[in-house]
Amino acid sequence: MNKNNFDVAIFGNGLTSKVMCLVALHYGVSFINIKGKEKEEKNADDIRSLALSSASKGMLKILGINLLSQPVKKMIVLEGGVSRGKIKGKVIFDAEELQEQIAHICEYSVINKSLEKKLKLDSKYSITEDPISITEDRDYSKIFFKNKKIIKSKLNIFTEKLDTNQQNITNTEYNFSDYDQTAITTTLEHSRDNKGYAYQFFLKNGPLALLPLKKSRSKNLSSLVWTEKTSNISEVLSNKNVFEKTLNELCGTYLGKIKVYVDPISFPLKKAICKSQLINRNILIGDAARSMHPLAGQAWNQALRDLAYLADAIVESKKLGLDIISCPSLLTFKRKRKIESNAFVEGISFINSVFMSESSLAKGFRRNMMKLINNKDILKKLIANEASGGALERPSLLINEEAGSKII
């Protein structure tokens, strides 16, 4: 193959793009990683922690990534319950009762380092330039760069939200809406052992999540994801001592004495859904396809689900000798993932709006739903299965099998 001809071109420099590079290496397809000029180092100091489903963790293991993570033994979802206040509704997911792992909490930096160590990519696999145009031919697309370089690719995979230029050259359109909320994330040190318990508190202005982390140098640690009205964020973060005092008042009952372990970061929350995930030879996955509210902690699991479907299509293309955009698996992806993705994003948005509403109808609905779910193990299992990779049919990598294992 010509040195500028590739099976896939992978756009982005985050975790999703790196896993996609790993998929390409694992299944023997040629690829180039187009990182872009401005994005190359943006993820170096990311302090977030991610909740991986058991299926996602198993998928990474098949690809050679064994992550050191904290298993979630219980996921405790509460309306109220902070500042020694009354608990108005609750759902408890217990891994022992469900007989399956709920989630695994791992720091972004740990995942990133594990991926980079496994990949060990040299410069021949990547480009740190931004494309200026993409044209379509019958059997491939051409990607043009400012430095006159031209790349040919059978499939262009976008893993991060497309900037204005990329939207224009790929004819991508998004539907946007603003949550009018901002998320705060940081790592907390606390006096009590987290016991592997995760908490999700639904508060008046948005959810607050505590995710258990593994101990570091005998220190008890948890990750905080706190969503507040954007208009309140500057006050919440104005003073570290006041921020710590507020967290102790809210969560001290569960974690003991709390200290902020790393400086918090904040980011505004917006919902974005692409109108089509497959446009000619351009496919959008992960953050390129959707931005969702963080209350369920499912954004990266959804990205890995995209990748698992795409891996099936790549293997099918090789086995059957078909152009990848003609493969049944990719056509199924286009149809099925759009429906799944939209339903998931809108469902999470609906839950957020219901818990922020002060109407008596919304209060009655959410508390009755929490009571129903908490008393029905079958509903808990259904929710846990959907979060873990799909309650019904799953792609091969999410059932602990190599991609393409279902293809005859």
Annotate each PLM feature.
Residues 3-4, 58-61, 70-169, 176-184, ...:
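Conserved N-terminal helical subregion
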Residues 6-9, 13-74:
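Glycine-rich FAD cofactor-binding loop and adjacent beta-loop-alpha segment at the N-terminus
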Residues 13, 160-161, 292:
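Glycine-rich, N-terminal phosphate-binding loop of Rossmann-like dinucleotide-binding domains
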Residues 163-198, 228-232, 247:
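Central beta-strand plus flanking loop segment that forms part of the substrate or channel wall
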Residues 204-267:
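Conserved FAD/dinucleotide-binding core of flavoprotein oxidoreductases
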Residues 207, 271-273, 289-301, 339, ...:
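Glycine-rich phosphate/pyrophosphate-binding beta-alpha loops
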Residues 267-284, 342-343, 359-361:
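FAD-binding beta-loop-beta segment adjacent to the flavin cofactor pocket
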Residues 312-408:
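C-terminal helical "tail/cap" subdomain of flavin- and related membrane-associated enzymes
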